[in-house]
Design a protein with these regions (language model features):
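N-terminal anchoring/stem segment of glycosyltransferases
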Residues: 1-61, 70-73, 182-183, 195-197, ...
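A conserved donor-nucleotide-binding helix/loop in the catalytic core
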Residues: 53-78, 88, 92, 188-189, ...
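The conserved acidic donor/metal-binding loop of glycosyltransferases
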Residues: 81-85
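Conserved donor-nucleotide/metal-binding helix-loop-beta segment in metal-dependent transferases, i.e.
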Residues: 86-123
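Catalytic core and acceptor-binding pocket of nucleotide-sugar-dependent glycosyltransferases
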Residues: 129-222
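Activation corresponds to long, low-complexity, non-globular regions
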Residues: 223-227, 287-346
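Extracellular carbohydrate recognition and processing domains
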Residues: 237-262, 294-311
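Short beta-strand-plus-loop segments that form exposed binding edges in beta-rich domains
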Residues: 269-276, 330
Length: 346
């Protein structure tokens, strides 16, 4: 396998840290950035300008999807999200898992879903996109008669034959859709490959945990100060109700107050990402049947927040117009906490 291979990423503004890598001879590692403060002895820096005034997020997506003239000297490009750490031999990975002799592009299968319509709902639940933008895009897909369960990619890693014309045509459509509709590239990728007919080799591995890539999480600049609240299971993007409520701080506790808009038996409260924090208590103002906290490592009386959004699941009988107050304590993970939790796990 003598193809010229590059691994590349893009960090705009100060959204991510540039991770160290396990370098492999014969592969070049490129970081495109508009931040001159970012330096690395592992990555070759390629400085870029925002000539189209896209803003940091779309500029990074542009490099991710459309690439850059610098990449045209390579046969194969491997895009890696700025939150991923490259840790394994990538020539072996390309040879064993990507099948580029038969396909011009390879992607990891989404680890949870296989359908754009389900992913659109998840984007609202996890506050990845505005509902109005999602609905506009879903209307477009329905007009195009785009099928359900067509497939869904984890777009954190993309392996492409860099100069393949069908790949370039598909990437152009992908970026156009991203700019026109919702700014979540996972939503517009399946339609793009369906529309152009680009054949993809699907990699059936967890992109976040495998011998070649490891998830390190994006930088969290500030704490989430609002909660997204759902009543019973959120299935219908068009009609089901949710609320966005503020998170207030009083007496070392976080407090969420809201009126329940309909009779229901379960309320889920998404309080956002709090990686490295611990929640030591959660209380509700009304009588309930059960309360669960997910995800995280549950070691009573601690719940350790991980990379995903923290969600409180509250079960009971709730009436329309009923006032509910949620109190919880959250703070930084200390060495004392680590020791106490370690003792409970032994």
């Amino acid at each position: 396998m003598n193809e010229r291979i590059c691994v590349y990423t893009c960090i705009t503004g100060d959204y991510d840290n540039l991770h160290e890598i396990v370098k492999e001879d014969g592969i070049e590692y490129l970081c495109f950035t508009n931040n001159p403060k970012i330096k690395s002895s592992y990555w070759k820096m390629v400085y870029i300008e925002d000539e189209d005034n896209l803003g940091n997020m779309l500029l990074s997506r542009k490099i991710k999807i459309l690439g850059h003239p610098y990449l045209e000297q390579y046969d194969i490009s491997i895009w890696v999200d700025g939150a991923l750490e490259v840790k394994g031999k990538l020539r072996q990975f390309v040879k064993e898992w990507c099948d580029l002799s038969r396909y011009p592009m390879a992607c990891f299968c989404h680890r949870l879903r296989n359908c754009v319509y389900d992913e659109a709902r998840a984007c609202i639940v996890h506050r990845k996109a505005d509902k109005e933008d999602v609905i506009k895009y879903l209307n477009f897909l329905e007009q195009e008669e785009f099928p359900k369960e067509y497939g869904l990619a984890e777009c954190t890693v993309l392996i492409r034959k860099e100069n393949d014309l069908e790949v370039k045509r598909t990437m152009k459509l992908w970026f156009e859709l991203l700019c026109k509709y919702v700014k979540r590239d996972q939503l517009s990728f399946p339609y793009s490959i369906w529309k152009t007919g680009l054949k993809i080799h699907w990699i059936n591995l967890n992109v976040f945990d495998n011998p070649w890539f490891f998830w390190k999480a994006h930088k969290q600049k500030e704490e989430t100060k609002s909660a997204r609240i759902f009543f019973d299971e959120y299935k219908d993007v068009y009609n089901d109700i949710y609320l966005d409520g503020s998170i207030e701080s009083e007496d070392n506790k976080e407090i969420i107050r809201f009126l329940i808009p309909k009779e229901c038996s379960e309320i889920s409260v998404n309080v956002g990402k709090h990686f490295g924090k611990i929640i030591t208590s959660v209380d509700v103002s009304s009588t309930i049947k059960a309360l669960d906290v997910f995800p995280g490592m549950d070691v009573p009386p601690y719940t350790v927040a991980d990379y995903d959004d923290m969600v409180f699941y509250i079960k009971g009988h709730f009436c329309e117009g009923q006032k509910l107050i949620i109190y919880y304590e959250i703070h930084d993970f200390s060495e004392v906490d680590m020791q106490e939790i370690g003792e409970k796990l032994v």
